Amino acid sequence: IAIRRPMKTPTAGTEVFALENGNGGGSSTVPEFAAPFASDLFYMQNRNGGGLNYNGSRLAGNSYLQFNGTAAEASGLLRWDSMNGMYFYSTTDYTGYMFKRATGFMDVVAYTGNFSTSATQAHNLGVVPELILVKGRSQAYDWQGYSEPTGKGKVLWVDKNYQATDSLVTWNNTSPTASVFTVGQTADVNA
């Protein structure tokens, strides 16, 4: 196992973020999307309007989630290449947003919830997160979001066209810290 931490805080956005338009070629030998760094999180948005948008992470391997839906994690549509980017098997034009984990910028966390009690989840940002997005991978759960402006008593419904709603349960009415965030007793974030 190779672990590439700790990492310096980025000084330029291009060190941790790349954007590329795919051509829908679906090649298994040439990456559809490539970044100048090994990306850790990937988001694909359909450029033709409508359709499904996907995201995946190096941590989850060749699995992906629908970003604008509740479906459980699936596989077979994309494949990570550790140094060259993302292979995507589709004939639709997508824009790929690629992110690299970095102190003070972005982290990817996977955990197993317990649904019975609140739980803290560790992260490696080194700063208090301003945005947290959570999606249960095993079943059809909604995407849940926390944002610093809305605070610990609200939940963002990422996959729905809803306003932030009151919820003292989702984040256990607890603000995140520079090392952990808290999930409450709800299946969307703790199952």
Report each predicted region and the residues it spans.
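Surface-exposed molecular-recognition determinants
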Residues: I1-A191
